[in-house]
Amino acid sequence: MSIFNQKSKFKVKTEVRKVKQAVEPTPESKKRYVGNGSASASTNGTPRASPTPSSLQVKRPRPRPGAGAASPATGPSLSSSTSASPLDLTRKRRAPAGSSSSRSPATASPAPRALSDSEPGSDDDDDDDWRDRLDPSKRRKRAHTEDPDRRLRHPRLWAGQGDEDKPGIVHAVQVASLADKCQPVMKLARDEVGVRLRYPGAKYTERYELVWGKDKIDGALDIMKVVKFVASTYLTDAEAKPFLDHNLGINRRLEKSKNTNDGEGFKAALAEYNNQLLALQTEGAIARNIDAMRGVPRELVEFILDQVYDRTVAPKVDLLAKYENGTDNVYGELLHPFISDIFDRTKLSSDMVFVDLGSGVGNVTLQAALERGCESWGCEMMENACNLAEAQKKEFTARCRMWGIAPGKVHLERGDFRKSERTLAALKRADVVLVNNQAFTSELNDHLVNIFLDLKIGCKIVSLKTFVHDNKIAENDVASSILEVEDLRYHEGYVSWTGAAGSFCISTRK
């Protein structure tokens, strides 16, 4: 029996806890989520050096598992209903239950966002021609959070001068190739599928093969997305025009070649992209533009994280299905949009400390470091998840360098967070703590409350289940005396084990 359930020997004045109930309308599946008003800083357009920055909007299917934490529901079978199931992870990440999406794993998830003055947000906008989204004069602004204190340039950014050591990424060809029984695309011969792709932050390029295979990276699609993100995020409108011009731009040529199965045309457009980006790197344009940025567009954050996941976790995702039902070691993921929403609500910024208790494969820990630039900690005890988390961290470090972005410091700890000295020390400095306690036992939740006694005043604790229970005697409920709770709702497609909306809490240490 938990010590908190025993009858008290002392008479203590009863304290009435106050619970804030945030009433939010039930989201409609077809409407986009509009970023809440409690965003940490101003939510603006793409962080660019140019006064009229470019941005990218890509239509995407329902979100796939893209952020992690140890938890959710019970029952070994996967249901197509919206009832919770323990894990919806096959070889590649799929959409939550209830979604009909079966798109390529390279496709990232939609993020909650704030609308700019030029974007009314009606459903009709989704039908706008894709050219409008690439035209610098009509380009829409993508939500991100600007942090005036953040410096985004990676300390090892290659700016066209001298040599550099290889970043050590997992190349796309290592997970999707002819050797993996994939087939050539765009009428290319087997000896013609090899290509290289340049990134804005490095001299070295990534190796791809233009092939297709079930549950494999779509090399051509991945390349096209990189080209769009580089042009729309790292360049001024004038610099981006050769890439995004809707008639003769490189992106248009790539898309046309892919649609017409013109492999040679695709390779020619890719070669021109590589050459033009190299010229911009050499003349210092990339470094100059990154220096003017104060935030990373959420779509780019999601894409980078998906690149990391698809090259490290996805090929071994079956390892995550080995969990012990009915214990604290059940695996499930909070998705990118949910995590961004949490960061907004808790006002997480680059000078803060974030801790994820039960961090799974490290998705949330990495997202906090990349999206907000903060010091980010995660602790996990499941061996398979820990091994994949280490692989993700290594690839994440290399990928951020390729993209020229400096993330916050990442710390991943193995073991029980109740006993990890480094994790407990980090908790004492933490500003935001995430606990995906959807399937935690009552004993573990009670132990967590005891740990929360050491949190600093004002620390935000985000959990899927409250630590304050109405059925407990108030005078014996430690949680009610130290936590002020706000009950909230998360939207559809925010977690991996169900496509339905649900509830969560943000508790403030008082």
Swiss-Prot record:
Q: Which organism is it from?
A: Chaetomium globosum (strain ATCC 6205 / CBS 148.51 / DSM 1962 / NBRC 6347 / NRRL 1970) (Soil fungus)
Q: Name the CDD domains for this protein.
A: AdoMet_MTases
Name the Enzyme Commission number(s) assigned to this protein.
Answer: 2.1.1.360
Q: What does its activity-regulation comment describe?
A: Ubiquitination of histone H2B to form H2BK123ub1 is required for efficient DOT1 methyltransferase activity on histone H3.
Localization = Nucleus
Function field: Histone methyltransferase that specifically trimethylates histone H3 to form H3K79me3. This methylation is required for telomere silencing and for the pachytene checkpoint during the meiotic cell cycle by allowing the recruitment of RAD9 to double strand breaks. Nucleosomes are preferred as substrate compared to free histone.
UniProt entry tagged with the keyword Repeat: yes
Any idea what this protein is called? Histone-lysine N-methyltransferase, H3 lysine-79 specific
Q: Does the keyword Transcription apply?
A: yes
Write out the entry's keywords from A to Z.
Answer: Chromatin regulator, Methyltransferase, Nucleus, Repeat, S-adenosyl-L-methionine, Transcription, Transcription regulation, Transferase
Main localization (coarse): nucleus
- Which stretches does the entry tag as region Disordered? 1-165
Q: Which GO terms describe its biological process?
A: DNA damage checkpoint signaling; DNA repair; methylation; subtelomeric heterochromatin formation
Q: Where is the composition biased (Acidic residues)?
A: 120-129
The residue ranges flagged as biased composition, category Polar residues, are: 37-57
Q: Where is the composition biased (Low complexity)?
A: 65-88, 96-114
Q: Which InterPro entries match?
A: Dot1, DOT1_dom, H3-K79_meTrfase, SAM-dependent_MTases_sf
Q: Which family does it belong to?
A: Belongs to the class I-like SAM-binding methyltransferase superfamily. DOT1 family.
GO MF annotations, alphabetized: histone binding; histone H3K79 trimethyltransferase activity
